[in-house]
Amino acid sequence: MKKIMILATLGLLMTSFRFQADTDAIVNAFKAADAQEIGRYFDDFVDVKLLDKDEVKSMGRNQATLALKAFFAENGVKGFEKVSERELGNTMYLAGKLLTKGKSNNITVMLRMKDGRKQIITLRIS
């Protein structure tokens, strides 16, 4: 019984480090303004709201990646500052400031656990 508890605890710890690694990779991709890397963490369908544009529900992964890449190019994104991170069950919220030419925009990312990793299901830049 003791061995089972130890193995279960180790398994839980290892998966929690994996989940934190996903979050760190997403934050680093935003800091580098790397839409392709961010796109790797998109779910199959993503709700996307970009600055001064209507929200698009259930945008496909590839289309969302292209839209984000175009946004980064148009706005000269230079970096990202994480403001907060909250986790509720298997859903996580990540908020921060996207640094562009001369100003910063608020960004909110909602992620959920799917297939053993965090995937972005909502992306809002305002």
Regions found by a protein language model. Give the residues of each.
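Short, low-complexity N-terminal intrinsically disordered segments enriched in polar/charged residues
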Residues: 3-28, 32, 40
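Exposed acidic/polar residues on beta-strands and adjacent loops within beta-sheet cores, strongest
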Residues: 24, 36, 81-90, 126
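Surface-exposed, charged secondary-structure patches
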Residues: 62-104
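Short beta-strand edge/turn micro-motifs at domain boundaries
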Residues: 104-126
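A short gly/proline-enriched turn/hairpin at secondary-structure junctions
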Residues: 48-57
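Stable alpha-helical elements in mature extracytoplasmic
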Residues: 22, 26, 34-37, 60, ...
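Short, well-ordered alpha-helical segments enriched in acidic and aromatic residues
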Residues: 35-45
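Hydrophobic residues embedded in beta-strands of well-ordered beta-sheets
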Residues: 46, 90-92, 118-119
